[in-house]
């Protein structure tokens, strides 16, 4: 019995040994097979590439962030605060901040007549014939509409008084005639001359009341005027040089002081001075005009001679010594019908007035008819235009100024 058991035990242990050897052999083979190494490496690569991919995605997304930090760092966009800093755009906006003010000036306007003038052809007759206030400035109203300020000399009175002054010529018109200026796009008047009291002191006050009632800007002796356009203030002073140089200088000095307190951007002085029916400029005109510029006037406009005179550039400002007649009811048929509209464009850059010579003249006739005064100022054409420009060039020659064939200052 014991022997059988031993044999059985031997058989069992042999089986164990054999199976263990087989297991060992299998284990050894499977561990050291090159195929199994490759698979593990692939898995490792797969894992590591996923890990890389996983880590690369953050890097990539962060790199947009980091590259977006160049984008933020590329604060060229913020650094496109060069765009703001590159305030050439802001500087270019300052260019669009340039303001141009065009002023048109014309001469003596008498809306009415002397009662001694021929009743069939005087101003009253023409007004009654046309029954239309737009008739008188019809041919120049577009010019005046396209500027920023139109200024004329108002010579006469708007009154119903009959207390005529003892003088050779005395002018008055119906107060309703003011609408002639309004329909013609006239914005302001100077009112300091030898005809503003033709029907007594009362007629002067009546006329001013008409201006005020109709909101017409006016300057007269000590009364200055401020006209606002395009965010700029234009100050106006009017003096009567026929009453003496010292009187004019007084009003100019006081007027400029008042206007400077009002912080105006431009100052225009209108002076009524000179000798009638001559192209010669006298010392009174020069003295008053130069004084005005020396004290701060940017432009001086003259009238009274009833004929054109030269233009001078003095210390950077233009002086127009005489603008002649314009819509002039004071003469039914003047021998000299030549006149003009003077225009100057002032340029402001960053609120500062630039030095420019943007000046032109528009040759005109006081009438659209050559044979009579029909009180309808009209731009000259063809030979008449050429002749008036040539005339002005001869008047301006002493001051070294001249105009081209279109009336533009050379």
Predicted regions located by residue number:
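Acidic, metal/ion-coordinating pockets
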Residues: 91-410
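Ser/Thr/Gly/Pro-rich low-complexity, disordered linker/stalk segments of secreted
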Residues: 47, 51-95
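Sec-dependent N-terminal signal peptides
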Residues: 12-30
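N-terminal Lys/Arg-rich, disordered targeting/topogenic segments
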Residues: 1-13
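Acidic, serine/threonine-rich low-complexity intrinsically disordered regions
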Residues: 1-3, 41-43, 66
